Amino acid sequence: MRRIAFFPGSFDPITKGHEDIVRRALPMFDKIIVAIGVNSSKNEMFHLEQRQNWIEKTFSDCPSVEVINYKGLTIDACKKHQAKFILRGLRNSNDYEYEKSIAMMNQAMEPSIETIYLNTHPEWAAISSTIVRDIIKNKGNAQPFLASGVQL
């Protein structure tokens, strides 16, 4: 059985922290699906196609990374794509408490799917897509915080 991990997020935009988590997880899994969740009630800064293109460029050197988008529950998308693991990055204890609650609900809905946490590298722990969007909105230079495939 292949070890398939599902790495969900809005990736609006994808950051160095996201990229670092996926690259560090590559040796652990046969395949990592970077999955852009489509949420119609969320106002994204960047169109879905743009985000998907950036993620594909970022991981163009990684044949075991697949980029998709999905609607609905993450756990349902995991089942659809035969992923037995949900990959999450943790920047701090607040992230852990939030992610733990979601993982417990996912476990209740589908006990065969495990959530795997990787601590964010300290260099990227202060970065979030929200902060990066704020830098961009205020015409600052966000490039140092963006994944390698992103050019603004």
Where are these regions (language model features)?
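Nucleotidyltransferase catalytic core that binds NTPs
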Residues: 1-152
